[in-house]
Amino acid sequence: MENNRIREEVLETIRYAVNNSPFYRTHFSTALLGELTHETFRQLPFTTKEDLSQHNRDFLCVPAEQVAEYVTTSGTSGKPVTLYLTKKDLQRLARNEKESFELTGAKAGDLFQLMTTIDKQFMAGLAYYLGVQELHAGMIRIGPGVPALQWNSILENKPDILIAVPSFLITLIDYAKQNGIDVNQTSVRSAICIGEPIREDDLSENVLAKRIHADWNIELFSTYASTEMGAAFTECRAHRGGHLNGELIYLEVLDDDGKEVPHGEKGEIIVTTLGTEGTPLIRYKTGDVARVYRETCSCGRTSPRIGPILGRKNQMIKFKGTTIFPPSIYEIFDSRSEVTCYKIEVAKDYL
């Protein structure tokens, strides 16, 4: 543990979970829960997606009547699971997004246009909405799709910041070209990008970001978040990785042997949530692989940062002594304008 404050917060999270979660009550050995050190913490077993799926309700730490929101994971890597949020958890979520927005230069009085869903138990849309309120800014909740409606709102309401899946920004650009709209003569100054990477492994712009910037001169911010952690890693204006909010998440980035990777190296993101009431998670294996950067950012912040998600650990392809993640293959096809649809299959060559 880096310092006494972090150690106490992590220890408090563990005590709370063991005292209130049926899952953690049996998951941890009491012999490991005394004096918490860096070494004893690393001896605690991981929490996996399978644990959360198979014992979902046993993670709940409060009576059902204290649950204010039920949110679910996307299910992209398995069966969707439910996370239970109390009013305090919603306040934590709002604080996280407010501070994430501030990293991008957003401020009170700005106007956001939300181009993602806020229904269907989707946490991200809810988090963005709460964060905007906490920032004392304004929000236009359009939701996903419908380029005509999005542009009508942009031209009429003049938002400063868009929250969108970056590939949808390409759709907006195409619509604007077809309808005589000059994208660079609008009020929009930036877009907070969700769900898709806009950075290469070296933190430079990837093909998608370059395609957007070829037509639209707005600042793009990369984010990484998950429903389970209830927090986000967001770029500052230096665009050198998403900053950790160390008051909400304790971060580990580990190699295949469970050892912390050095600065600039890649590993699996492991999180322990801090300050959660409904569904705290301890040493949760996200399955996502990214590089970690620990040097002081040029913005002056000293918090660790993570690069773009290179892929999911369970989707890693080993080919002729090299490790490949599917997103690196996607980018090759995405860079070819003549390719509109593709499918990738991985098989062993037995011939």
Regions found by a protein language model. Give the residues of each.
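Active-site glycine/GP-rich loop and adjacent strand/helix microenvironment
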Residues: 1-16, 135-351
